[in-house]
Swiss-Prot record:
Compositional bias per record (Polar residues), positions renumbered to this chain: 185-195
Biased composition range(s): Low complexity: 196-206
Quaternary data: Interacts with full-length and the N-terminal 249 residues of CcmM; a probable CcmM-CcaA-CcmN complex can also be isolated. Interacts with CcmK.
UniProt protein name: Carboxysome assembly protein CcmN
Main location: other
Compartment list: Carboxysome
Species, as recorded: Synechocystis sp. (strain ATCC 27184 / PCC 6803 / Kazusa)
This protein's GO CC annotations: carboxysome
Record's keyword terms, sorted: Bacterial microcompartment, Carbon dioxide fixation, Carboxysome, Photosynthesis
Amino acid sequence: MQLPPVHSVSLSEYFVSGNVIIHETAVIAPGVILEAAPDCQITIEAGVCIGLGSVISAHAGDVKIQEQTAIAPGCLVIGPVTIGATACLGSRSTVFQQDIDAQVLIPPGSLLMNRVADVQTVGASSPTTDSVTEKKSPSTANPIAPIPSPWDNEPPAKGTDSPSDQAKESIARQSRPSTAEAAEQISSNRSPGESTPTAPTVVTTAPLVSEEVQEKPPVVGQVYINQLLLTLFPERRYFSS
């Protein structure tokens, strides 16, 4: 891969910020930035050569560049980093919290990064995640009780009647007067001279109805009214369902 050329820097001096120690025999090109964060230090030993436009930053640790080290133009070094003696760092390379051994040649455009330090930095910058998980953990001790399913209870069998249907049937039976009682009441209400007409014989058969009709409660006093109409008007043979 062909790297773009390093642009010239208009500044004739390099920039220094923080605790930076530079040996008098070191050579630093214009436009170089040396920046050390609080409680951090940058040490450049004898014979070190830093190319045009490179940036060296000490963050969360010290940066130490040992003697006779060559850093090509356009490099980025973020500490803590230790570069061994007589090592060579190619142009436009990036070093992030990764040490370089002595007499090592790094090709141009390389990326050297300490993944363990990167993970620790990310974990330290997000403490709210641990607090959220700690707050959520007590809720798991008291889980929510499951809602019972309506299909767990089996429906009653078709042949059995519910208690409400049995109560309705018993009330209907008690409210029905018998045929003999209805005849006695009618005969007592007539005078002695009147002849009592004979009531036709009525044969009742159990109607074949569906289960839905049987479940309906009968009308109170319906049988009594039918017997009374048969007695008063035998010629019409009135039947009422």
